[in-house]
Amino acid sequence: NAEYGFDKNGRQRYSHFNEYHKPQISLNHQWQIDYKSSLSTALYMSIGRGSGYSGQGRTSADRNMWKGTNYGVLNTTFRNPDGTFAYDKIQEMNAASPDGSRMIMSKSNNNHMWYGLLSTYTNQISKSLELSAGIDVRYYIDEHNNEIIDLYDGKYFSDDSSRANVKPEQNAAAADPNWVYEKLQVGDKVYRDYDGHVHQEGVFAQLEWTKKNLNAFVSGSVSNTGYWRYDRFYYDAAHAESEHVNFIGYTVKGGANYNINEKHN
């Protein structure tokens, strides 16, 4: 483990750590309408909560120093004689820096809420003809941000490498040149902070015909998928919500199968 090491207090440290929890809840209902038709419905929800460590720095060079290896080559900048990663050296560098921490650790949060409904109606129209049709509806919200969790002995951190890309016409705070160098503390957001929204609505149907050794079907579906984003990092509240974009999709399929005998078709 090229990132294994200790800080100046002898505490074990690491720059790679991931955790994720994603429970799923579903409610299913089966309705036998009559002897030839039925309705199957599932309502479900997925709750995802997780994060992983993400080393940040004032410059891209600083950020790369968090990597124990780079393309298979050992990073020796912060390396002790015994081979462990020298987290204490990062603390010393940050404490001595007059411009706050050069390297800090953030937690990359990636959460989601996913809701969905799937309902399928089946009807045995005749001995040889069966109809299946239904709806599929989903709504997905994902939350992504990077939160400072450790300044590594620096007094603050300035995320100027990211904030320099924020335009005043999109975020009024960027009109103040000092905002780019704001002195951030543990709990503040760096690099990104946004929510993504996705909704999908679809209908589908299939008609299947069976007669002795011959089976044929035709099916089709139509769906709409919409996207939009709410960005709190690069935009202020007046501009945070992006354009809503929708895409219509469809499928048409057909096929047939003939059973020559019990083993071949």
Model-derived segments and spans:
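Acidic/polar loop-and-plug regions of large Gram-negative outer-membrane beta-barrel proteins
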Residues: N1-N28, Y53-S106, Q170-L184
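C-terminal/domain-terminus segments
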Residues: S46-M65, V222, G226-W228, R232-Y234
